[in-house]
């Protein structure tokens, strides 16, 4: 049989192929020749054939039929054969294939070989693709080589030990004695791999940092020698001595100094030297400075050192390299919580980054700008952010608008400024704002009694001839309906009043109704506004009746229903119309979970103002309750009665009260309800309907201890209890769900079931997102009727999304305190 072509000739031949089909034909032809050679057990050219096969594998062609030939080369006594055999094993084999176990004995023999290069090949292969079984069998040999005096073998053995620890963490203690002398080595390769091994051990075991903290002075000494040493051609990179080793040492110091005062004190001086002596003109120096900054911010460093670190990040923002600017912004986001005033010094540079062409830098700069907003700089920062909102790409507008809303709500210097700012956002990016922006602005306007005339005049001007920004039109329609009389009377004192007639106001609202840009929701706002004006205007009531009657036959079901109900008010209930359509009272602002929450971005955390989310408006789906009952099993479970989202009449009078309004958890008298502008809708009877709207709960709740009903995977559910004054059989349980992990839990749903002798109602939760780092809680109220005073038992089901996975769990709660049910 003729000798096969050499690898170099094969490469040259393949490169001459003009088409992919021609290349594929050459590969198939050569693979056929290699297979024939393998079948004939040709030992002479096996090494050459496997080398060609590896090249084909690199091109993406199948080469699995050469796996056993690699094992034969490994068993050969020739170094050239072993080299190709081990390379093939690393490329063609992995721990998912049982074939790799066949070479365990060969690797063991080669680890004890007399030639260091053969030992090095075996260490490289084991460190690259060794399975947990192989690591357990060969860990002893690796540990012996870790103690050898040969620096070539020690560095390879250290890296192999890293792989062994990753695969079999319980073998970590085997390598502890060998790590004692590793840092005494002069060879930089051994030092580098030793630091990698120590870092891996500290990250894998929480006990290791305390064991290795005694090495901090030695690490500091090595790092100082690297900084102070002169030019060394062997280790010099762009004028810096071995930057790779410096970075690794800084990372290890960061782990060892975390939460330890003594270690942090020992490394303060060297970190200051690195930060001041490192050259920043080259990217190598910037990499070392970045690691230094991370170490300073992570350990218990001095305040002056932290200021130095943040100033380094500030210099990074001026760098021409986009990657360095992005890294600086990300790092400042992490530090702004602890060093807010220091980061403020770089505010102008951060704001300039909003004008960067790179979208990633823009987003980081926007997030950091919102984190820097406070009561002192709110006007200037909002001016910059509104300019950014006006010119940024569409994908930024929603987040930017939400951030402006939240910052304005928290730090607004005056109500007029607050209203002007939100109206500017709605005018600029109204189509991108969140759904809760409209009700939040309406609530703000309602509560700013002295600004009603000014606001309705501004909104009237804003929508003249432009209905493209639907949220703005909705707010304007609501305000015109509420305060149309102030608009017509021209009572605005803040700016020059405008002369508007009743017909002109109705013309605007009718234009909104017939505009092609108006959504169904916007038309509903406009029709309701026109109806409200029937009690505020005097000369146009007949026109309003005509408009309302026209939409009684609208093809939009929602609009038709509104029009029919309003027509009934004009005809059958005209004596109630003025009372039902009177002006809305001041609304109470409900906030949850504190002023701030943690926003998660790319695995890092930064503070952002809390986004107050309204509770879900609809009832809990019946199918979810039924699914819960199916999973819980048994026939002694009573179903969950869902909460009705609409209001129901109170037994005390004709007011409309929400279900949640029936129960005042603070024990204070219930607030007077708002007059309704729609007819009352009857509700099915509920077990607690007979309770009056008087204060229901007494101070006995203070004596009922709370319990932890569930605690697993970072999610904690706590129950607190209250008892009714008017009906002792009613227990109200308030659940609080908190999340101690680093990522938010989304789409959170809590369900519960009780035995048939009880009745249970779940009210709507405060949110569907459980914030990370215990920065907020979800609250939900459960009402339980226990007429027979039996011991309370409950089964719960939890569903949520976390780290991209859907989670679900069931639990049983039997440890209710006796005071909650006796």
Curated annotation (Swiss-Prot):
The gene is AP1G1. The keyword Repeat does not apply. Gene3D superfamilies: 2.60.40.1230, Leucine-rich Repeat Variant (1.25.10.10). SMART domains: Alpha_adaptinC2 (SM00809). One of its GO terms (cellular component) is AP-1 adaptor complex. PANTHER family: ADAPTIN, ALPHA/GAMMA/EPSILON (PTHR22780). Residues 702-817 form the GAE domain. It is found in: Golgi apparatus; Cytoplasmic vesicle, Clathrin-coated vesicle membrane; Cytoplasm; Cytoplasm, Perinuclear region. Residues 597-628 are annotated as: Disordered. Its main location: Golgi. It is a peripheral membrane protein. Adaptor protein complex 1 (AP-1) is a heterotetramer composed of two large adaptins (gamma-type subunit AP1G1 and beta-type subunit AP1B1), a medium adaptin (mu-type subunit AP1M1 or AP1M2) and a small adaptin (sigma-type subunit AP1S1 or AP1S2 or AP1S3). Interacts (via GAE domain) with RABEP1. Interacts with EPS15. Interacts with SYNRG/gamma-synergin. Interacts (via GAE domain) with AP1AR (via coiled-coil domain). Interacts with CLN3 (via dileucine motif); this interaction facilitates lysosomal targeting. Pfam families: Adaptin_N (PF01602), Alpha_adaptinC2 (PF02883). One of its GO terms (biological process) is vesicle-mediated transport. Signal peptide: none annotated. Subunit of clathrin-associated adaptor protein complex 1 that plays a role in protein sorting in the late-Golgi/trans-Golgi network (TGN) and/or endosomes. The AP complexes mediate both the recruitment of clathrin to membranes and the recognition of sorting signals within the cytosolic tails of transmembrane cargo molecules. Keywords: Coated pit, Cytoplasm, Cytoplasmic vesicle, Golgi apparatus, Membrane, Protein transport, Transport. InterPro entries: Adaptor_Complx_Large_Subunit (IPR050840), AP1_complex_gsu (IPR017107), ARM-like (IPR011989), ARM-type_fold (IPR016024), Clathrin/coatomer_adapt-like_N (IPR002553), Clathrin_a/b/g-adaptin_app_Ig (IPR008152), Clathrin_app_Ig-like_sf (IPR013041), GAE_dom (IPR008153). This is AP-1 complex subunit gamma-1. Belongs to the adaptor complexes large subunit family.
């Amino acid at each position: 049989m003729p000798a096969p072509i050499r690898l170099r000739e094969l490469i040259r031949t393949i490169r001459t192929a003009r088409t992919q089909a021609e290349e594929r034909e050459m590969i198939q032809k050569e693979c056929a020749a290699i297979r024939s050679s393998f079948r004939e057990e040709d030992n002479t050219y096996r090494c050459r054939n496997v080398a060609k096969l590896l090249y084909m594998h690199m091109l993406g062609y199948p080469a699995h039929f050469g796996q056993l030939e690699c094992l034969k080369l490994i068993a050969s006594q020739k170094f050239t054969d072993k080299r190709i055999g081990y390379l093939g094993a690393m490329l063609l084999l992995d721990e998912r294939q049982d074939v790799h176990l066949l070479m365990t004995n060969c690797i063991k023999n080669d680890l004890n070989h007399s030639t260091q290069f053969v030992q090095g090949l075996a260490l490289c292969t084991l460190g690259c693709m060794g399975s947990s079984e192989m690591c357990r069998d060969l860990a002893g040999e690796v540990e012996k080589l870790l103690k050898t005096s040969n620096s070539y073998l020690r560095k390879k053995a250290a890296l192999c030990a890293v792989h062994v620890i990753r695969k079999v963490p319980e073998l970590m203690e085997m390598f502890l004695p060998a790590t004692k002398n590793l840092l005494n080595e002069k060879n930089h390769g051994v030092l580098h791999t030793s630091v990698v091994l120590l870092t891996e051990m500290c990250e894998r075991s929480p006990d290791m940092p305390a064991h290795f903290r005694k090495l901090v002075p030695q690490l500091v000494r090595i790092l100082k020698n690297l900084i102070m040493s002169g030019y060394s051609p062997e280790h010099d990179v762009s004028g810096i001595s071995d930057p790779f080793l410096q970075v690794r040492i800084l990372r290890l110091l960061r782990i060892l100094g975390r939460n330890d005062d003594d270690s942090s004190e020992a490394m303060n001086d060297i970190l200051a030297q690195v930060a001041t002596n490192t050259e920043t003109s080259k990217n190598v120096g910037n990499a070392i400075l970045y690691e230094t900054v991370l170490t300073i911010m992570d350990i218990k460093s001095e305040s002056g050192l932290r200021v130095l670190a943040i100033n380094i990040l500030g210099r990074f923002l001026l760098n021409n390299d986009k990657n360095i600017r992005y890294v600086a912004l990300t790092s400042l986001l992490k530090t702004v919580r602890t060093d807010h005033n220091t980061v403020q010094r770089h505010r102008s540079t951060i704001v300039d980054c909003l004008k960067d062409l790179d979208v990633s830098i823009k987003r980081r700069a926007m997030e950091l700008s919102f984190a820097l907003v406070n009561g002192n700089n709110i006007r200037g920062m909002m001016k910059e952010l509104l300019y950014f909102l006006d010119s940024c790409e569409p994908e930024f507008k929603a987040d930017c608008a939400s951030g402006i809303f939240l910052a304005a709500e928290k730090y607004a210097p005056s109500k007029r400024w607050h209203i002007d700012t939100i109206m500017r956002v709605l005018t600029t990016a109204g189509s991108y704002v969140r759904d809760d922006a409209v009700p939040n602005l309406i609530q703000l306007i309602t509560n700013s009694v002295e600004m009603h005339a000014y606001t309705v005049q501004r909104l009237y001007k804003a929508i003249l001839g432009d209905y493209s920004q639907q949220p703005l039109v909705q707010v304007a329609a609501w305000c015109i309906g509420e305060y149309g009389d102030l608009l017509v009377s021209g009572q605005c004192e803040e700016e020059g009043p405008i002369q508007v007639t009743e017909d002109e106001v109705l013309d605007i609202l009718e234009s909104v109704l017939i505009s092609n840009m108006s959504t169904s929701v916007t038309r509903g706002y406009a029709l309701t506004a026109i109806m409200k004006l029937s009690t505020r205007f005097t000369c146009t009531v007949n026109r309003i009746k005509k408009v309302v009657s026209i939409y009684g036959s609208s093809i939009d079901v929602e609009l038709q229903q509104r029009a029919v109900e309003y027509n009934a008010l004009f005809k059958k209930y005209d004596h109630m119309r003025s009372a039902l359509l009177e002006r809305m009272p001041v609304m109470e602002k409900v906030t949850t979970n504190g002023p701030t929450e943690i926003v998660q971005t790319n695995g890092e955390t930064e503070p952002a103002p809390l986004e107050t989310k309204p509770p879900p408006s609809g009832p809990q789906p019946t199918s979810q309750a039924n699914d819960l009952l199916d999973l819980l099993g048994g026939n002694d479970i009573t179903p969950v009665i869902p909460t009705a989202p609409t209001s129901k009449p109170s037994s005390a009078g004709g007011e409309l009260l929400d279900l949640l309004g029936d129960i005042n958890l603070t024990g204070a008298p219930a607030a007077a309800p708002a007059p309704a502008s729609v007819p009352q809708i009857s509700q099915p009877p509920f077990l607690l309907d007979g309770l009056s709207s008087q204060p229901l709960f007494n101070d006995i709740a203070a004596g009922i201890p709370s319990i932890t009903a569930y605690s697993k995977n970072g999610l904690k559910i706590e129950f607190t209890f209250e008892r009714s004054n008017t009906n002792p059989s009613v227990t109200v349980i308030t659940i609080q769900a908190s999340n101690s992990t680093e990522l938010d839990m989304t789409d959170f749903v809590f369900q519960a079931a009780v035995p048939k002798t009880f009745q249970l109602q779940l009210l709507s939760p405060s949110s569907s997102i459980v914030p990370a780092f215990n920065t907020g809680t979800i609250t939900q109220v459960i009402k339980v009727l226990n007429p027979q005073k039996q011991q309370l038992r409950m089964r719960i089901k939890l569903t949520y999304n976390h780290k991209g996975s859907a989670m679900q769990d069931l639990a049983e709660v039997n440890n209710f305190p006796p005071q909650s049910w006796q």
